[in-house]
């Protein structure tokens, strides 16, 4: 019985992949390492744990994406205190961002609603003490309009040493 409780109580951990799973970028958003092909692109189906991060959004995050979002990145990566999240859209969409640690503990949860189409870049503050030096985190993003999923994915980020 105790074994069952311990097994069921364990949370899955994020596997960031080989070579830290981070796409390193400089202060000008130029890649300075091998690019992780699973980061900053369209994801397939998310696990139950990943879907739960977006409960209450009113969007089926495992439905078929209805649009395209381009040029998604976060720089610099690793991050010292501030990160710039960038993307380009051809429709007026809302954006939900969730940053989690390797045990899926939510550290940042925010929504943006730019008024129109275009290229966007905005600053995210990572100075909170919950972001530890040298640690890796995962940022999930969902672009949506009403209850329609337009695009979703993730990117792995690291705090500078």
Indicate residue ranges for each PLM-predicted region.
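C-terminal tail/sorting-segment detector
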Residues: 14-20, 25-31, 35-37, 138-161
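Short, surface-exposed loop/turn motifs with a glycine/proline- and acidic-biased composition
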Residues: 115-147
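Short, glycine-anchored, charge-dense loop/turn motifs used at functional sites
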Residues: 97-109, 136-142
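Surface-exposed, proline-anchored Ser/Thr-rich loop/turn motifs
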Residues: 60-88
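C-terminal motif of bacterial Sec signal peptides marking the signal peptidase cleavage site
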Residues: 6-9
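A general sequence property marking short-to-moderate contiguous segments
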Residues: 41-65
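Solvent-exposed serine/threonine-rich low-complexity stretches and specific carbohydrate-binding patches
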Residues: 107-117
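Short proline/glycine-enriched turn/loop motifs at strand-loop junctions of beta-rich domains
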Residues: 90-95
């Amino acid at each position: 019985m105790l074994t069952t409780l311990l097994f069921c109580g364990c949370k899955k951990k994020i596997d960031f992949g080989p070579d830290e799973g981070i796409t390193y970028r400089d202060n000008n958003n130029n890649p300075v390492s091998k690019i992780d092909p699973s980061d900053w692109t369209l994801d397939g189906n998310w696990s139950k744990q990943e879907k739960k991060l977006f409960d209450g959004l009113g969007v089926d995050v495992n439905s078929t994406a209805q649009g395209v979002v381009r040029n998604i990145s976060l720089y610099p990566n690793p991050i010292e205190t501030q990160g710039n999240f960038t993307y380009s859209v051809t429709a007026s969409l809302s954006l939900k961002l969730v940053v989690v640690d390797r045990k899926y503990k939510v550290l940042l949860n925010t929504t943006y609603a730019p008024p129109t189409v275009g290229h966007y870049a905005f600053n995210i503050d990572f100075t909170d003490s919950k972001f530890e030096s040298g640690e890796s985190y995962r940022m999930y993003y969902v672009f949506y309009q009403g209850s329609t999923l337009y695009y979703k994915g993730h990117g792995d980020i690291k705090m500078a040493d």
